[in-house]
Amino acid sequence: KRKDLDVFILALPHGAASEFAKPLYDAGKKVIDLSADFRLSSPENYKLFYGVEHPCPELLKKANYLIPELSENKTILNSKLIACPGCYPTSVITPLYPLLEEGMIQSENIVINAMSGVSGAGKKVSESFIYCERNESAVAYGIPFHRHLSEIEEQLSKAAGKALIVQFNPHLAPMKR
């Protein structure tokens, strides 16, 4: 409702962010989205990995997937809809993108073994996330279709200039704060 605001940062659940992003975008506002709603350019991949139809697929191609360290300032300044990457994708894309873009590593057979504490697995309540279950025990999860896989493959494919398939193995590890 406030017309004096130019930039909106959305920190909403996947699916909900789109409902707010569309009218803001249409009103000419800059939208920075922290959810996964605009991270993928394909509505088919969004449905495959998030289990629902994308609420406004017409905006997917208009969103700029942005890791500041890999983006030019003009891209950041000129973007009206910014999709912020997920945690695992940030940790994978940031080092691999420039290496693939410059042809410094082979693009075939990329294997990514990533680990996070249980807080990296989301907010759902699960017995497997409590300390006594995780302590001294690392476990892989979300294989072979972790929802960040499509995001990683899409961005690394752009860097390599061809379609890539990577092996992404996320793990929950016992990490104390």
Residue ranges and their predicted role:
Residues 1-143, 161:
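N-terminal Rossmann-like NAD(P) cofactor-binding subdomain of oxidoreductases
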Residues 142-177:
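Oxyanion-binding "anion nests"
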